[in-house]
Amino acid sequence: MNLTHPCRDQKFIDSIGLKVELVDIADFKYVKVLATSKYLINNSSFPAYFIRRDEQVYLQTWHGTPLKTLGKRMRFGIESMYNVQHNFLHANYIMFPNEFTRKVIMEDYNLEALYTGTVVMNGYPRNSIF
């Protein structure tokens, strides 16, 4: 996680009583936490070195409605889509807010015949909490 104000963000988390520690993606501790966490939730992609262990549960929520060009439809898309596709394929669950988003992501990242996890049709956490 690239933190703009890590001290301020950590102070806020501590002030509301959450037992959460922010770890910068550039810190070696991030690698350890990523490798040893039981639950992984991401709305983007983990670094290219990430491989989910069998005992980990990975929920991929992506980060928006795909109204722009993605994956193989991008210029140089086939060459540049590796890490995103890699992350989707390691997820146990991929959450989509609607059928349009599911269709675009599954097609643009060539997941239709490759993805063996569970597709969850549900609102996004940041929107559906309200």
Predicted segments, located by residue:
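Active-site and donor-binding regions of nucleotide-sugar-utilizing enzymes
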Residues: 1-130
